[in-house]
Amino acid sequence: MDRSVFFEALQNLPIKHPGLQLEFCADVGQQALLEGKADIAWFGYKPEERGLVAIPMGYNVSFLVASAKYLKSHAEIKKVGDLINHPIIMRDTANESFSQILQCEFCNYEIGPEHKILYGDSDACKKLLIEGKGVAIDMNPNFIAEELLDGTVQPVLPGWHRKPWPLHICCRKSSSKDPIIREAMGIIRYLALHQEPNDWKSWHRRLHLPEQMVLLPKL
C-alpha cells in the first residue's frame, strides 16, 4: 500500500483538532511505541506486547522479482528449486516480519543457509534489486511501483510468493481510548482495507499473476 495516501488523509487532523502536531517516523518498533516515542505504529506482524492494542488490517503479499538486466544475463528461473543458483535479496533478520518461507498454494519452499542471501533494509534491498544483484522475495510492490510498471523490474516464478504477513495498526493500551488516537487509527485502517488500486490483489491482476495461489491464514 502506498503510504503517501495515509499521510495526505492524516494531514486534515490538525485542521480539525487545533494544536495537534503530526510527525511521521520510520522503523518504530514495539519498545519505542511503549516508551512514547510514537503514539501509533503500523506493523507487518502481530505484536505480542501486553501493553499494546493491535487492530488487524488485512495482509500484504509480495511476489518474487528481479531486474530485467539480471534476467537477461543469468540462467532462466523455471522452477523454485532453481533459486539455489541465484542470489536472494531479502529483508534482514532484525525485521519483525522476517520470513524465509516461500509459498505457492499448498507448496512451501524455504530459503535456507545453502542459498546465497543478500540482506538489507527496504532501501538497500531496492538498490540491490535495481542494480541486478539477484532475486528479491519480500519487496512491497508499491515501493517498486515505477520499476514494475516500466518493466525495469519483472516478476519471477509467477504464483510463488513470500509467506503473507499480517498488517496491524497499534497504539499503547493506555491511550487506546483517546478520541484523536482512535480517529487516526480508524482513518489508517479504513484506507488500508479500501485502497483497492494499491493492494496486493490489484498488483497481481495488473501483472497477470495467479492470485488463486495465495492462501491467506486467519488474522
Segment roles from a protein language model:
Residues 1-50:
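Central regulatory/effector-binding core of bacterial HTH transcription factors
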Residues 17-25, 107-116:
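A local structural motif
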Residues 28, 44-46, 66-68, 121, ...:
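Beta->alpha turn/N-cap motifs
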Residues 39-41, 63, 88, 136:
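Short, well-ordered beta-strand core segments
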Residues 51-57, 61-62, 66-89:
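Flexible hinge/capping segments at coil-to-helix
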Residues 86-108:
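Secondary-structure junction motif
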Residues 109-155, 161-162:
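Hydrophobic hinge/microswitch elements
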Residues 144-146, 150, 160-219:
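C-terminal effector-binding regulatory domain of bacterial HTH transcription factors
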